Amino acid sequence: SLLQFNKMIKFETRKNAIPFYAFYGCYCGWGGQGRPKDATDRCCIVHDCCYGKLAKCNTKWDFYRYSLRSGYFQCGKGTWCEQQICECDRVAAECLRRSLSTYRYGYMIYPDSRCREPSETC
């Protein structure tokens, strides 16, 4: 669920997802278009593509089980959808952590009107 994804992001990056990632670049937050602006934005398009493969799942609201072991998230047992959603979120949160050094505050609230290049495909 988005609530759980927010918790993963906060743990991995020490940043609250809403102000720091909800409107970042061309792909973080709802939807996306154009080319990713940087590594952080690329994490978001990969997450969008991951969710896109789960069209039959309720990706935004389906709760899943996960735990934290030795500083890493581990997805738990559940339905196929729950496990896949958890993996999408886990991989994206870890990607955002790896991208922290290139995070640009100028992309934090980025207007969609600046995302007009041809969109990348999954």
UniProtKB/Swiss-Prot annotation:
Pfam families: Phospholip_A2_1
EC number: 3.1.1.4
Cofactor(s) needed for function: Ca(2+)
The UniProt record lists the keyword Iron: no
Protein's GO biological process: arachidonate secretion; lipid catabolic process; negative regulation of T cell proliferation; phospholipid metabolic process
Top EC category: hydrolase
Subcellular location field: Secreted
GO MF annotations, alphabetized: calcium ion binding; calcium-dependent phospholipase A2 activity; phospholipid binding; toxin activity
InterPro entries noted in UniProt: PLipase_A2, PLipase_A2_Asp_AS, PLipase_A2_dom, PLipase_A2_dom_sf, PLipase_A2_His_AS
GO CC terms: extracellular region
Residues binding Ca(2+), per UniProt: 27, 29, 31, 48
Keyword annotations: Calcium, Disulfide bond, Hydrolase, Lipid degradation, Lipid metabolism, Metal-binding, Myotoxin, Neurotoxin, Secreted, Toxin
Active-site residues annotated for this sequence: 47, 89
Catalytic activity field: a 1,2-diacyl-sn-glycero-3-phosphocholine + H2O = a 1-acyl-sn-glycero-3-phosphocholine + a fatty acid + H(+)
Residues in coiled coil: none
Disulfide bridges in this chain: 26-115, 28-44, 43-95, 49-122, 50-88, 57-81, 75-86
Tissue occurrence: Expressed by the venom gland.
Major location category of this protein: secreted
Functional summary from the UniProt entry: Snake venom phospholipase A2 (PLA2) that induces myonecrosis and edema upon intramuscular injections in mice. In vitro, causes a potent blockade of neuromuscular transmission in young chicken biventer cervicis preparation and produces cytotoxicity in murine C2C12 skeletal muscle myotubes and lack cytolytic activity upon myoblasts in vitro. PLA2 catalyzes the calcium-dependent hydrolysis of the 2-acyl groups in 3-sn-phosphoglycerides.
UniProt-listed PANTHER family: PHOSPHOLIPASE A2 FAMILY MEMBER (PTHR11716), PHOSPHOLIPASE A2, MEMBRANE ASSOCIATED (PTHR11716:SF9)
Family from the record: Belongs to the phospholipase A2 family. Group II subfamily. D49 sub-subfamily.
This protein's name: Basic phospholipase A2 Cdr-12
Organism ancestry: Eukaryota, Metazoa, Chordata, Craniata, Vertebrata
